[in-house]
Amino acid sequence: MSSITIEELKQLPENSYQIIDIRDEIEISHGAVKGAVACKPEEILSNPDVDKAKKLVICCSRGINSKEVAENLTEEGLDAVSLERGYIAWLMDVMKNSQDEDFAKNVEISLR
């Protein structure tokens, strides 16, 4: 598997993977995946914050640049996948879940 969807990621045990955000500093300053390690692609192997014993989920803006990075890391012997649709997919999922929570709260309030 060279890529993973948000839904597939949610099925993994939380401590079994680490998200690596390869976007640049400007993109990350506008928002980032909670708990992700920000790292330039060329520094992943040498970054002490990267837990190479875990599945590495590589995240870029749209899931395009992360594919090549994940493939290169796999060739180096690491368990690495690209996050399909990247940060945008993560953000859309967060927004959807927030809307669901808001909807549930509104229903609960309306039933009182």
Summary of predicted features, one role per range:
Residues 1-18, 25-55, 64-112:
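Rhodanese-like catalytic fold shared by cysteine-dependent sulfurtransferases
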Residues 59:
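Short, surface-exposed ligand- or partner-binding patches at beta-edge/loop junctions that are enriched
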